[in-house]
Every structure is written in C-alpha cells, then in structure tokens.
Design a protein with these regions (language model features):
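Positively charged n-region of N-terminal signal peptides that target proteins for export
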Residues: 1-5
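C-terminal motif of bacterial Sec signal peptides marking the signal peptidase cleavage site
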Residues: 17-20
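Sec-dependent N-terminal signal peptides
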Residues: 6-12
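C-terminal capping alpha-helices of c-type cytochrome domains
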Residues: 157-176, 180-202, 296-298, 304, ...
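A gly/proline- and charged-residue-enriched helix-loop-helix capping module
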Residues: 149-154, 163
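Short, conserved catalytic or interaction motifs in soluble domains
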Residues: 23
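Anion-binding catalytic surfaces of enzymes that hydrolyze or transfer phosphate/sulfate esters
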Residues: 182-219, 223-228
C-alpha cells in the first residue's frame, strides 16, 4: 500500500501547490462595489491658462463629461492590472497632488518601479510625458503603465478589452461616452486621457496673487520670489515664456509655475529639444533618462504635496532639493552648463534664511484645493 499511497500524496500535493500558486498569481480579491457617479459633476470648464498655452487635445477626442466620468472609473479600477490589485491611482494619489508619497511606487507583483511617479495635474497643457519624455501624446502615455511589466502587468493589452467587457457596469459608461458599449483600447485610452486632462491646478496662492499684484504675499514670500529669479537662478530652467504677469519692468512670469510645462516653445528652454537636463545628482549617471543622465524639467506646481522629489525620489524635503542646488551638485561629465561656474559645479552660497524664503515662495505654487475636490476622488465606495 505504501508504494501506491506515496504517489497519490505527491500528486495531491502538486495539485494543491498548483492551485495555491495560481490563486496567488491571479489574486482575484476585487472590491464588490460598483462605481457611484454624480451626474451633476461638470468637468468641462475654461482654464485660466487657455489662450496662453494651447491644450494638447486631439481633434478626435473632444472633452466631454461622459468621457471624463468613464475615465475616472478606469483610473481607479484595479482591474486594469494583471492581478486586479493596482490601479492608476495607486501611484497617482489625490492626497499627494496625484503623485506618490513613495520614492518609487509598488507594482502589481510587489516590485518597485524604476522611477518616481510624476504628478498628473494640468496635463491638458503638457506636450511630453514621463521623465524621459518618451511620448508626446497623452492617449499613448496612459496605456504604457498598464502594459508595463512592473507597474500593472497587462502586457497583452488586447486581453484588457475582454476583461472590461465582462464587467457589466462598463457597458453604459462606454455607450454614454462613445456611443458604443463594447470596450476598445482606443476608447479606454481616450477616456483615461480625458480624465487626466480634466484634473486642474489653478487656485494656488500664486494664482490668486496674479490679480492682486502679489499684495497677498508676505515679506518672506516676496523675498523668496526675488531669490528664485536672481541669486538662486531657478528660472534658468523653470523658464520665462509667457507674459501672463510682470514681476517688474523687465521680468516676466515663468510658465512652469502655472502649467506642467511642455516642449520647447511651451514651457521649457534647454540644450535638449525635449526640455531635459542633467543636474549633477551623481558623478556617473546610472539612469541615463533622455540620454546622458538628462531628465525632463518638471513642473514646480504643488511641490508642498508631491514629495519625495527628483526622478528617483531621493530627496524627501524641499530643503534637501535646495541644498543640492546650493552646494551638492556632482561634476558629472554631462552636467548642464546652467549649473556650472567656470566649468565647475555652481555654489549658490545661500544663507539659511534665504533657503527658508525660497521654500516659502515655492509653497505658494501649491493648489491645496485639488486634494479635496470630490469630482476627482475614487467612485468606488
């Protein structure tokens, strides 16, 4: 009998082991709730930036409330990941200005992403995406994390169509948005893109100051604004393009204060046509980014919400960022010329009270209303 029992036990063990592994792989623990959508929410609005920067909306994907509502559900739905555990919102959290509070985000299988999650606000006026600016179209960008082998794991995107088609609540949402109830990759991408485009950030203290002649700024914030333009020279990268407001008779408003920045001509000036720069984080760049250790120049909006900072999330505070530019720049062979003096890394020699003033000014660029806006919260309750 023992001769026969052993194979049976081994076979049973293999079956149990296989089923356990299969369950671990698929991880089907989904929320049982369906989305609750408020039809009174209006996402179609005129931005204060329209007329200053052209929106990146393609002609075949006009912004509508129905598309944004569908995109909102997709954005928060973990079904878009292979294991039904990770959604777009897992790495772009409303409480943190639609960025992540981790240096690197956690993917569908527990692995860490290669870079820090960039905030997704005012993307309606952005024309390059990711730290390496690998795409210029938001409709292309939105599906790349879904298919990424670390982030969401749906490497065969065609399976996503069938997966969502099996979810009953999607049928009317797709029909309302596109007049066609069956999910398609094209419509998934368009809806996600429109939800992201609809997320605004235009009510910071700085925004309010534009119409008030900066009379709402305290002395420290005014001093920090002056440092930004002069001694700290921040606006050599976060640059001046549009004359939305005048600081003084000769200095105009750096566009990247207001919007997420775009390619050359819409927000960035750089030796790279994609608005990237090597800022001397390391003597030798382990991540080459756009090439030679260059990374996209990010928006300065909502900095008080979006820590940690840099492409790898290495700095936990704004003070650490300022200390880097003040005296921590490494002499990388590809170091941007704007960060050098006499062919050596710059030393700004900022005093402690100047650093505090610079931080005070940078915080005026944060729109705290975005973390409270119910229109952009999860619809799954």
């Amino acid at each position: 009998m023992r001769i026969y029992i052993l194979p049976i036990l081994i076979g049973l063990g293999l079956i149990l082991s296989f089923n356990f592994c299969k369950k671990e792989e698929s991880n089907i623990a989904l929320k049982s709730t369906t989305p609750i959508l408020d039809p009174s929410y209006n996402y179609v609005h005129t931005s204060r930036f329209q007329g200053q920067v052209n929106p990146n909306e393609p002609l075949d994907n006009v912004l509508t409330n129905a598309k944004v509502a569908l995109g909102r559900v997709l954005f928060y739905d973990p079904r878009l990941s292979k294991t039904n555990t990770v959604s777009c919102a897992s790495c772009h959290k409303q409480n943190f200005g639609f960025a992540d509070n981790l240096p690197k985000s956690i993917g569908f299988n527990g692995q860490l992403t290669k870079r820090n999650s960039m905030p997704i606000i005012n993307e309606r006026f952005n024309f390059s995406f990711f730290w390496d600016a690998r795409t210029r179209k938001l409709e292309e960008q939105v599906l790349m994390p879904v298919a990424d082998h670390i982030e969401m794991g749906m490497e065969d995107l065609n399976k996503l169509e069938a997966k969502l088609e099996a979810v009953n609540f999607y049928k009317p949402l797709f029909y309302d948005a596109f007049g066609y109830s069956k999910p398609t990759l094209d419509h998934i991408a368009k809806a996600l893109a429109q939800f992201i485009r609809a997320i605004p950030s235009e009510n910071s203290k700085f925004d309010q100051a534009i119409g008030l002649g900066f009379s709402n700024f305290n002395a420290q914030e005014v001093f920090g604004m002056t440092l930004f333009r002069e001694k700290a020279n921040c606006n050599s990268c976060h640059t001046i393009i549009h004359s939305l407001v005048t600081f003084n008779k000769t200095t105009l408003l750096p566009t990247n204060f207001l919007v997420n920045g775009a390619m050359t001509g819409s927000g960035y000036v750089s030796s790279s046509s994609f608005g990237g720069t090597n800022i001397g984080l390391d003597k030798v760049s382990s991540d080459l980014g756009m090439g030679s250790g260059k990374f996209k120049i990010p928006s300065l909006r909502n900095l008080d919400l979006t820590a940690p900072y840099m492409h790898d999330g290495r700095f936990a505070t704004l003070m650490e960022v300022i200390d880097h530019y003040d005296s921590g720049i490494q002499n990388n062979e590809h170091l941007d010329d704007r960060l050098t003096t006499n062919n050596k890394p710059q030393h700004l020699n900022l005093l402690p009270h100047e650093k505090e003033a610079l931080i005070a000014f940078l915080k005026t660029l944060t729109d705290y209303t975005i973390v409270q806006d119910k229109k952009f919260r999860t619809p799954f309750y």
